[in-house]
């Protein structure tokens, strides 16, 4: 699990390369606020947290698929996503 978290951090840092960020992970098991508009796949690993930059918290959900494709959704509290980054974790 730590390898996935490190990969997610690297991917986020690459996307915010011009800013200093901290990535904070929260519970991976509580997806209940997001289930209304997400298709939950039992084979996918989900990580919830937020990016902290310049005092601003940006929540995210990261999905790691069985083939290590990673999708990171920013501000998942909405019924739409403000941004989507796709990358591969090589773990």
Swiss-Prot record:
Matching InterPro entries: DUF5461
Pfam families referenced in this protein's UniProt entry, alphabetically: DUF5461
Highest taxon of the lineage: Viruses
Name recorded for this polypeptide: Uncharacterized protein 91
